[in-house]
From Swiss-Prot:
Record bears the keyword Transport: no
Subunit structure: Part of the 30S ribosomal subunit.
Species this protein is from: Rickettsia africae (strain ESF-5)
GO biological process, one term: translation
Xref: Pfam families: Ribosomal_S10
GO cellular component labels: ribonucleoprotein complex; ribosome
Gene Ontology MF, one: tRNA binding
Gene3D superfamilies: Ribosomal protein S10 domain
Protein name: Small ribosomal subunit protein uS10
Chain's role: Involved in the binding of tRNA to the ribosomes.
Cited InterPro entries: Ribosomal_uS10, Ribosomal_uS10_dom, Ribosomal_uS10_dom_sf
Keyword annotations from UniProtKB, A to Z: Ribonucleoprotein, Ribosomal protein
Assigned protein family: Belongs to the universal ribosomal protein uS10 family.
Length: 105
């Protein structure tokens, strides 16, 4: 029976995301666990177009975009020390973390 922990990190800022992945990888490597990653996932770009003027000049528009960067870390066959190390890691405020436990039978 093989267990895996999948950690998905999402952020608007790629620098804070890379810093968070480095902190998690170093914390897991201190416990001598097997880790794969960080695997960069495709970034999602959302574009919005709005009128510059509320009344006339319909052709005058402005475009904005939001870039969502994502990374994936996979920890193979974790032990309780890994879970303890992950709970002690302090990450930046702009990084969203989703942790999934996957058990293979």
């Amino acid at each position: 029976m093989k267990n895996k922990i999948k950690i998905r990190l999402k952020s608007f800022d790629h620098r804070s995301l890379d810093q968070a992945t480095k902190e998690i990888v170093s914390a897991v490597k201190r416990t001598f666990a097997n880790i794969n990653g960080p695997i960069p996932l495709p970034k999602k770009i959302e574009r919005f177009t709005v009128n510059r003027s509320p009344h006339v000049h319909k052709k005058s528009r402005e475009q904005f975009e939001i870039r969502k960067h994502k990374r994936l870390l996979v920890i193979g066959d974790p032990n309780p020390a890994v879970v303890d190390a992950l709970s002690k890691v302090d990450l930046a405020a702009g990084v969203d973390v989703v942790i999934e436990l996957e058990s293979g039978e």
